[in-house]
Amino acid sequence: MSFTEWLDDGMSMPTKAGFRHRLSARIGYCRAAKRKNVTIDKSCLVSPEARINARSGSITIGEGSTVAPYAVVQGNVTIGKGSSLQAYSILVGYGTPEDRVGEIRIGNDVRIASHVMIIGADHRFDDPEKPIAKQGVLRRSVVIEDDVWIAGRVNIIAGVTIGRGSVVAAGAVVTKDVPPYSVVAGVPARVIKMRKGEKTE
């Protein structure tokens, strides 16, 4: 059983593999927590293969949250309690601890599946005579409220807020705010129903 499967199983496996994964998570926590401007609750499970680096910002990961192998957390990022970030997902926030425009803010009990990308800035490209690489970025914060499920291979564009209790279907590209308790899908993502069961279209 892999580290990710062990996390998905609720960390309940009373075997040698379970012990090995718990030890691995402890090592991952210790490595990440000693980095500058990184605060991780001691109850978190962090794979040693995860990449956690605050760069010029700060990272906070709340009680009981998990970060799976090969997930990336960089820059200004806050993750609440009981949330999970699965393998190969990328969270990149911008700014500094004092200037949090461009931060990524994840609430409590949020599920982020594999290969999700959330970036707190977009490249500027207004001037066609100037290389895009030299035009800088436009920082805009991303907020994921509590109890949200983001399925695999989702892209969330800078400046978006995803409302509490929402579901983002696999492969969606979210370009605008998502209302609370809605289900969105598609490219660009649109509301296909509310969790109450009421279809919108």
Where are the model-predicted features located?
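Extended, small-residue-rich solenoid/repeat segments and analogous flexible loops
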Residues: 1-58
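Flexible, glycine/small-residue-enriched loop-and-beta-strand segment within the central core
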Residues: 50-61, 66-158, 187, 195-198
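Short alpha-helix at the nucleotide-sugar/activated-sugar donor binding site of glycosyltransferases
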Residues: 111, 166-167
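Catalytic-loop signature of eukaryotic-like protein kinases
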Residues: 147, 165, 182
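Beta-rich strand-turn-strand
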Residues: 153-165, 172-176
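Conserved G/P- and acidic residue-centered "switch" motifs that form tight phosphate/ATP-binding loops
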Residues: 168, 186
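Glycine-centered loop/turn positions within well-structured domains
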Residues: 176, 180-182, 190
